């Protein structure tokens, strides 16, 4: 009997250890892990520089209250600010906390300038921003909110890719538009660059803040440090998590000077956010991923992967409907049963995970090797042949 709550439908497999792109199960099997904790282990399992960072910091200081200065946090905040649009950073522990904090930052900004009624957040219907109460109501998904009433108010929703739907939902009380630059759980849907630029124009015209959720698609996952960079758009607020910790729990809200002005002492806090252990790991991750050569390689390997997947799609059009994504955030939309496909991949020692719209989500580590991509392509092709 397991004493864990039943809120996960766990597969009957557990792992003893991981190394790089691979996981080793307790029953002695080796798996190519293209889930990586759902885009968390950005540098694979047990990366030596991250292991060293944890070991080194663990011998000095694990935790200290944010009532005091934390040099490791100051260092990571500076690196993030220098690399991005941000002027200020506020650390959390997870993606859901980061999106919740982003909502607070947006509402608090308008409150601080004498517009307390300007507090509504406009989001994409059936998006994903986390599992906390505000985050599930921000998603606009009945599946996520069922049974968790009363409703958390202050959110409006528009259809993905429908600018007319968006414009109709904007009111004088709209504080921010919050979207995932690439929808992950929603089926690997990339918001086009022109669309992001249009969102920025709308926000500028209507005095609305732009929040771009990069919890899953950020920190090099797209081939750029942030997925929105290609569009040249500057958001006001960006929540991040997952990849910045390389497997260690870290979340953060990046914000410009204007919106940060509302976050005065006492307006938000986090007991564990920005702790020295997490910051030590985050600094190591930043040093590796922010390197131009590293990001260039992510783009190169992802182009190679996508081209090979599209060849499989052309060979098995009855199985694969579409290959989509950017960088190493890839979706295979199927014409066949998703659960069965993922199970067959797993039977062939390749781990993947589902997304909405019958999509198989593929999330290799950003430092994945070419021969590991080749191995995965071979397995995917084999499964397509079996199901054809």
State where each predicted segment sits.
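Conserved N-terminal phosphate-binding loop of PLP-dependent enzymes in the Aspartate aminotransferase
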Residues: 1-388
């Amino acid at each position: 009997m397991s004493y864990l709550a039943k809120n996960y439908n766990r597969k009957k497999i557990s792992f003893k250890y991981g190394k790089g792109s691979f996981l080793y199960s307790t029953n002695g099997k080796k798996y190519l892990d293209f889930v990586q904790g759902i885009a968390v282990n950005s540098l694979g399992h047990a990366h030596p520089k991250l292991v060293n960072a944890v070991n080194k910091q663990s011998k000095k200081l694990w935790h200290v209250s944010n009532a005091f200065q934390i040099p490791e946090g100051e260092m990571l905040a500076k690196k993030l600010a220098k690399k991005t649009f941000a002027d200020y950073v506020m650390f959390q522990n997870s993606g859901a906390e980061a999106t919740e904090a982003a909502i607070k930052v947006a509402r608090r900004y308008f409150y601080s300038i004498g517009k307390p009624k300007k507090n509504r957040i406009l989001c994409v219907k059936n998006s994903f921003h986390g599992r906390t109460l505000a985050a599930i109501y921000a998603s606009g998904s009945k599946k996520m909110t069922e049974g968790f009433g009363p409703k958390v108010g202050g959110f409006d929703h528009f259809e993905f890719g429908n600018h007319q739907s968006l414009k109709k939902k904007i009111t004088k009380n709209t504080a921010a538009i919050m979207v995932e630059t690439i929808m992950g759980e929603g089926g690997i849907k990339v918001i086009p660059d022109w669309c992001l630029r249009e969102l920025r124009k709308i926000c500028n015209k209507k005095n609305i803040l732009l929040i771009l959720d990069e919890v899953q698609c950020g920190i090099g996952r797209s081939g750029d440090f942030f997925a929105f960079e290609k569009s040249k758009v500057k958001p006001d607020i960006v929540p991040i998590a997952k990849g910045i910790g390389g497997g260690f729990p870290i979340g953060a809200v990046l914000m410009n000077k204007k919106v940060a002005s509302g976050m005065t002492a006492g307006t938000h806090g986090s007991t564990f956010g920005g702790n020295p252990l997490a910051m030590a790991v985050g600094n190591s991750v930043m040093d590796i991923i922010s390197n131009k050569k590293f990001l260039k390689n992510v783009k190169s390997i992802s182009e190679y992967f996508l081209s090979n997947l599209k060849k499989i799609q052309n060979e098995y059009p009855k199985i694969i409907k579409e290959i989509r994504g950017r960088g190493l955030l890839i979706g295979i939309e199927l014409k066949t049963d998703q659960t069965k496909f993922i199970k067959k991949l797993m039977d062939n020692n390749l781990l993947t995970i589902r997304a909405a719209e019958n999509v198989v989500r593929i999330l290799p580590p950003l430092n994945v090797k070419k021969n590991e991509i080749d191995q995965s392509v071979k397995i995917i092709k084999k499964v397509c042949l079996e199901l054809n």
